[in-house]
Regions:
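Polybasic, glycine- and aromatic-enriched phosphate-binding surface used to engage nucleic acids
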Residues: 2-197
Length: 199
């Protein structure tokens, strides 16, 4: 870790905090699913790191779209719990949100969650899993316990988390692969479009 020169921030990743503070949004959150609501995600909605929604655990599962500033666009995200207890096995607890599993254009994230995403582009699933495995590793857990004496996992500390060289190389490879796939898809679409015009 100490020889690492790259961080999540330097690699273009962003960690933000869920925008839905429930006691300030009581009139917006509900358990009723209507055409004017979208999923409200809590850490309890993750089982074995996978999103399960809706789920009955005593918390409202939907939020109204009346206040768009509280919502985020659907994308590939790593969710990180902001607070952990000293009794928990790991300091960092994560979950995954996959864009293709979300039926809505937007979602709400409860304020006790951080979410990790790319600043300039959407993370690929491979990128997501590489970073997720790294954050969930024993190595990262030990680093956080040594460098952070409290049980809060804040966005700034995550942004400054050193990225080991092997993880950095994996991420660069995943990005390159995604870029090549995107170029191929765009070229294929262009060819198909040109053929359609010529027919």
């Amino acid at each position: 870790f100490h020889r690492s020169t790259q961080t999540l921030q330097s690699l273009g990743y962003v960690v933000s905090t869920g925008k839905v503070v429930t006691f300030r949004s009581k009139e917006l959150i509900t358990n009723e699913h209507t055409k004017n609501t979208v999923p409200l995600i809590w850490m309890n909605n993750f089982k074995n790191k996978q999103l399960v929604h809706p789920l009955d655990f005593g918390k409202e599962q939907y939020i109204s779209t009346d206040n768009p500033s509280l919502l985020i666009d659907k994308s590939n995200y790593i969710i990180i719990k902001r607070f952990s207890s000293k009794e928990q096995k790991k300091r960092i607890n994560i979950g995954y949100i996959f864009k293709d599993k979300i039926e809505y254009t937007q979602i709400g994230l409860e304020n006790h969650l951080n979410y990790l995403y790319r600043k300039d582009d959407e993370m690929s699933k491979k990128e997501l899993m590489i970073l997720g495995d790294f954050l969930d590793s024993e190595l990262t857990d030990k680093y956080f316990r040594i460098s952070n004496g409290n049980t809060q996992v804040n966005a700034t500390e995550l942004m400054n988390l050193p990225i080991p060289d092997d993880i950095y190389k994996e991420l660069i490879s995943a990005r390159k692969h995604k870029t090549e796939n995107t170029r191929y898809e765009r070229t294929t679409e262009k060819i198909q479009y040109t053929r359609a015009l010529s027919n």
